[in-house]
Amino acid sequence: MQRIFHLDFNFLMLTKEEIRRQLDAVAAMGYNAILWELEDKVRFETIAPCIHPEALSKEEFAEILAYSRSLGLEPIPLLQTLGHGEYVLGHEDFVPLRELPEWKDCYCVSKPAVRNLLSLLIEEYLDLFGDIKSFHLGGDEAYSFAQCPVCAAKAEKIVLQRKARGDQRQDHQVSCSGDRGRCQEGG
């Protein structure tokens, strides 16, 4: 059975030593996987202007990953893809990628630049994490999702299509094949 510990760097920057102590404690408690929510705490080139001043280099984080693996902790990267975009969308270079100009929490997925940014960031994560079994693409708390005119029209069209065929489901499914995230939407 997988016992996953969520290590969230959203509001916290730990030193390498603090992270190692945390990993030691987590392994001692019987966890066997770490969900790594890194945000701006590793120096990703794709979002370079947004990086925390004390962020770890990729080399430093790779050493931490190796240590984590040596403790029997499977790494699971977590990348926020709809909401929780404040660490990127709060930066002036990325304001055009917001769902609504006045809110910095949600990406506008109708914009090709957003899909390109997230694809590049996913590639960086995959390169950094190496051989992984799982990749968590976060999509919660996207409070302004589907509110720009383009997204709202697409959402309305989907709702109308579902009603027309008698489908009342509110979920959205994405199926991915093995080729590094080549996904297809389904519903």
Go through the PLM ranges and name each one.
Residues C183-G187:
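Domain-scale selection of a single, long terminal region
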